[in-house]
């Protein structure tokens, strides 16, 4: 006991000193708490608890130990291999022969997303000499290699003998026509030969009387392919005067179809109507070559209609699109009216049941036709042009296209009023 009293709790002074020290600490902390209360927000709705000294000392931020591993960020722009360029759909990647990136080996194992776009290390793909199908030519046509052949030698003719004619398939055999009308038989006999066009005139009053006897030849003839081949041969090598005569015949025959309630269809065989599409394409080519069309368009500015209709028919034979385009404007030019007359019959033949609006528009054009209108339109236009145009080149070109004589082989009649 004595040792204990001597070592620690021997006297009362120690207790007094410890009490005094604790009182000093309490006296030091109490005014600090009051100061913190004073510096708080004005409405102390909930008093804050007194700060704990031991908690504040335990929440000190520790210093992070540095890791021995060094982290480095590598940008995708500084990688050693070359990423494959994005390819268009359906296009092969092209590898240049003088590429410098082939020396470095590429490891594609770590690149999972780019594994599908690997470049072949073999020979480069052969570049086509023609322009790509998708898109127009931007930088002009590609240059051919200097050692490319001009043409294949195997396509040259084997024999060097001069040829004075070309082989043409012969016409089928002709049979006797099944009709008893002498006037119609005489008309068919004249149609087989190239006779003057004045001998084939037929008045508009006589045609309805001879319609049914003539229908037995035009529609029910046993020589259908003979007549169609003869008419197409004449139309293919015809001048503008011959084309106008055939067009007058076709339009007047179509009017008789309309008056007798006949149906225009592709399945029916008709000598006159089945050559209307060839007649239309030939007329379009003649109009495109005529220089006097530009002179006629100065009074009635519908040159764009002529160009558009000629483009639709001459490029892809888009007859129905040409009729749709003609529906959008009023015809104010004789050349546009001539094209409308020529396109109405082929469009009426190929119109289906779903295109009733186009069919009715073609019938409206056909009803407005008068016998001999095509010849009269061209005659007035040419007369007006020759009296005003001083160009000699234009006059010579017009003479070559119009022609001086009409070929009437295959023509049955020329309608007149």
From Swiss-Prot:
Region (Disordered): 1-143
One Pfam family here: Herpes_UL69
Gene symbol of the encoding locus: EJRF1
Additional information: ORF50 and ORF57 are the earliest genes expressed in the lytic cycle.
Gene Ontology molecular function: molecular adaptor activity; RNA binding; zinc ion binding
UniProt zinc finger (CHC2-type) residues: 295-394
Protein name: mRNA export factor ICP27 homolog
Family, similarity comment: Belongs to the HHV-1 ICP27 protein family.
């Amino acid at each position: 006991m004595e040792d204990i009293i001597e070592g620690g709790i021997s006297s009362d002074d120690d207790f007094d000193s410890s009490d005094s020290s604790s009182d000093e600490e309490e006296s030091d902390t109490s005014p600090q708490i009051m100061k913190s209360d004073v510096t708080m927000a004005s409405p102390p709705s909930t008093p804050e608890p007194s700060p704990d000294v031991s908690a504040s000392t335990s929440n000190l931020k520790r210093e992070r130990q540095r890791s021995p591993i060094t982290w480095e960020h590598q940008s995708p722009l500084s990688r050693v291999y070359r990423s494959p360029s994005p390819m268009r759909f359906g296009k092969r990647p092209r590898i240049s022969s003088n590429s410098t990136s082939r020396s470095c080996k590429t490891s594609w194992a770590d690149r999972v997303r780019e594994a599908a776009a690997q470049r072949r290390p073999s020979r480069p793909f052969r570049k086509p000499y023609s322009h790509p199908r998708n898109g127009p030519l931007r930088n002009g046509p590609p240059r051919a290699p200097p050692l490319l052949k001009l043409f294949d030698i195997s396509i040259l003719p084997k024999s060097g003998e001069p040829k004075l004619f070309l082989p043409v398939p012969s016409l089928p055999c002709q049979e006797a026509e099944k009709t008893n009308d002498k006037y119609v038989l005489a008309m068919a006999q004249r149609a087989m030969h190239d006779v003057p066009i004045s001998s084939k005139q037929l008045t508009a009053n006589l045609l309805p009387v001879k319609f049914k006897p003539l229908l037995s030849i035009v529609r029910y003839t046993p020589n259908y392919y003979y007549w169609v081949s003869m008419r197409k041969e004449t139309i293919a090598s015809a001048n503008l005067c011959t084309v106008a005569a055939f067009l007058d015949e076709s339009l007047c025959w179509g009017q008789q179809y309309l008056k007798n309630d006949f149906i225009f269809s592709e399945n029916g065989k008709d000598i006159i109507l089945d050559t209307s599409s060839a007649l239309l394409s030939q007329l379009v080519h003649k109009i495109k070559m005529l220089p006097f069309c530009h002179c006629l368009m100065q009074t009635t500015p519908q040159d764009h209609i002529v160009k558009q209709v000629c483009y639709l028919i001459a490029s892809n034979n888009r007859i129905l699109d040409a009729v749709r385009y003609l529906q959008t404007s009023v015809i104010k030019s004789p050349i546009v009216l001539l094209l409308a007359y020529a396109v109405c019959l082929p469009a009426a033949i190929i119109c289906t049941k779903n295109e009733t609006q186009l069919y009715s528009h073609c019938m409206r054009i056909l009803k407005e036709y008068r016998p001999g209108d095509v010849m009269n339109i061209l005659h007035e236009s040419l007369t007006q042009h020759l009296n005003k145009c001083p160009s000699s080149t234009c006059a010579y070109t017009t003479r070559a296209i119009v022609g001086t004589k009409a070929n009437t082989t295959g023509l049955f009649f020329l309608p007149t009023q």
